[in-house]
Amino acid sequence: MIEIKINTDALQNGLNNIAQRTSNTRPLMTQLARIMRNAVLDNFEAGGRPAWAPRKYPSAREGSGLLQDSGRLRNSITPSSTATEAVVGTNVEYAAIHHFGGQTAPHTILPKNGKALKFGGRFAKRVNHSGSKIPARPFMVLQPDDEQALVDAVNDYLDAALGN
């Protein structure tokens, strides 16, 4: 019987070395979360990528961009990361309906200041609103160039870890 033995110690040591050098992924995940946040902010700056549906009444809020009347939604976009994940999100309660679109529930509108509301020259103590159809304006999306930036960041991390 012929027996061939291969010493794989060098290979195993090399693999262990690679595992050691790539074990701290926290800086990478932090960078990926920042890249994703910047991509979302770019979506706001561009008015959507691709462009979002225009306002139903364009002159109503002239000057402010879509989804940016107060800036609250845009400013709420926050990155977070751990050693194993990179996440971008928002805690604004109306974010989902603007991102995915949908129909708001029927509701009653009451005056905030004063005793009555004025609609079309008429006054009312309350108005029964049937709800609004909100078009989808996806702002939490990555474009191909954003995805490439993520791939480049991972490649740079691996190159640095492997000494390339």
Q: What annotation goes with each model-predicted range?
A:
Residues 1-99, 103-164:
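Short, Lys/Arg-rich flexible segments
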